[in-house]
């Protein structure tokens, strides 16, 4: 092989290397972009409201994307009772008290809700509570399946579907500075299961049980289970 040929080969190698680097960089950027837009998923236990112990065999799955959130809840409850799913959303969880978002960020006294709402913390955490878009009647075995969803900036339409939010959105508790979901990837989402009592035979009353806060209680409504999803 002549020196001219060897020099020619030496000159061409950097060009191939640069092309390879460009392709590799493009691949890395594409992968990073796809990872950034990919949905985040997590699965947590469902806890009993009274005992704070896990409900046997129950779970809640949350999927986050830039567009909003979707949830799947599988649990056991009282057979024949109507239930609705609610989201308690902390859009600024870094401002939650004691480093964890909970009742003390909503109520003045978590052990006595009649003491009133903690308006400063609701504002600081940019908290909101809305219907999760799901309701169902537990089957004869007590099994309950709920699949909810909420988009960014979405305000649930219908009576009794917005609990904590802005006064302009006609929230039942008009103390919020925001309504619904602002940051689906960064918010703390607490799914709450409300029991409305025995399912009504009247379709209109049943619809209220499945879609509105404390709707058509038969005879009472109570929060029985919850699941905490931390980003």
Describe these PLM feature segments.
Residues 20-31:
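Bacterial N-terminal signal peptides
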Residues 39-231:
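N-terminal leader/targeting pre-sequences
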Residues 34-38:
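Sec/Tat signal peptide C-region and signal peptidase I cleavage site
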Residues 1-16:
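N-terminal secretory signal peptides that target proteins for export/translocation
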